[in-house]
């Protein structure tokens, strides 16, 4: 179960068009934030809960499930990075955009904006052999049946070997840890009653099965 992961490490600003759409500066080096495992909602285990006074935005991402340990402060070889991945999944990195924007203005960390319960809906585990090249698949997210995000992972600014190398400058990646690799352009708001659907496609736009999942947003009681 993904909810039993030791940690969830996420890279920020890893697609150029997404950086531009939010008028963010381009980072000079990869940077990361953590999401709590309590944010994870697996298929069939509940809805997306939007708290009062929160402007929630969707961000679809390719997720990696670690199989092998990558110890901190040791080089990640060109051969070991792919071997260290056990499987994949599609995740929706929900963000309390108003909370994040306020934190950014004050120069404060914005993990709080990413960490609400249910703010990481995830799809089914995708066996590794179904994705020979994780840099050549298409992320797709639909809101109420309309496609709002659709782009290739080939557009990542920092590819997975660089992501792993940057994370392990500070911390080890252990078996079962999850890594989110960034979101493409097209992010936007979600309100109670909306239905989000996410999936992964091959470069030829064939759906990768299993990858698709659906989740409904509801207001917090």
From Swiss-Prot:
Cofactor note text: Requires a divalent metal cation for activity.
A GO BP annotation: tyrosine catabolic process
Family note: Belongs to the FAH family.
Cofactor dependence: Mg(2+); Mn(2+)
Species per Swiss-Prot/TrEMBL record: Schizosaccharomyces pombe (strain 972 / ATCC 24843) (Fission yeast)
Enzyme Commission no: 5.3.2.2
Residues at which Mg(2+) binds: 59, 61, 93
Intracellular or extracellular location(s): Mitochondrion; Cytoplasm
Record's GO cellular component terms: mitochondrion
Gene that specifies this protein: oaa1
InterPro entries: Fumarylacetoacetase-like_C, Fumarylacetoacetase_C_sf
Swiss-Prot/TrEMBL keywords: Cytoplasm, Hydrolase, Isomerase, Magnesium, Metal-binding, Mitochondrion
Name of the featured protein: Oxaloacetate tautomerase oaa1, mitochondrial
Catalytic activity: oxaloacetate = enol-oxaloacetate
Role summary: Tautomerase that converts enol-oxaloacetate, a strong inhibitor of succinate dehydrogenase, to the physiological keto form of oxaloacetate.
Gene3D superfamilies the record matches: Fumarylacetoacetase-like, C-terminal domain
Record-linked PANTHER family: ACYLPYRUVASE, ACYLPYRUVASE FAHD1, MITOCHONDRIAL
Domain of life: Eukaryota
MF GO annotations: acetylpyruvate hydrolase activity; acylpyruvate hydrolase activity; metal ion binding; oxaloacetate tautomerase activity
């Amino acid at each position: 179960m993904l909810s039993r992961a030791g940690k969830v490490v996420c890279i920020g600003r890893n697609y150029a068009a997404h950086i531009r759409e939010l008028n963010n500066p381009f980072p000079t080096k990869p940077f990361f934030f953590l999401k709590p495992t309590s944010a994870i909602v697996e298929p069939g285990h509940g809805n997306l809960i939007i708290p009062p006074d929160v402007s929630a935005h969707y961000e679809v991402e390719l997720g990696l499930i670690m199989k092998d340990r990558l110890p901190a402060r040791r080089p990640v070889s060109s051969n070991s990075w792919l071997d260290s991945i056990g499987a994949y999944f599609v995740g929706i990195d929900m963000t309390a955009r108003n909370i994040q924007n306020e934190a950014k203005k004050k120069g404060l960390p914005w993990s709080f904006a990413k960490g609400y319960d249910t703010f990481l809906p995830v799809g089914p585990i995708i066996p590794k052999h179904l994705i020979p090249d994780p840099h050549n698949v298409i992320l797709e997210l639909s809101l109420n049946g309309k496609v709002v995000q659709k782009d290739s992972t080939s557009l990542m600014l920092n590819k997975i070997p660089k992501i792993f190398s940057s994370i392990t400058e500070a911390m080890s990646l252990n078996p079962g840890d999850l890594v989110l690799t960034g979101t493409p352009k097209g992010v936007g708001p979600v309100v109670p009653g909306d239905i989000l659907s996410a999936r992964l496609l091959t470069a030829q736009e064939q759906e990768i099965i299993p990858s698709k999942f659906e989740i409904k947003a509801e207001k917090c009681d």
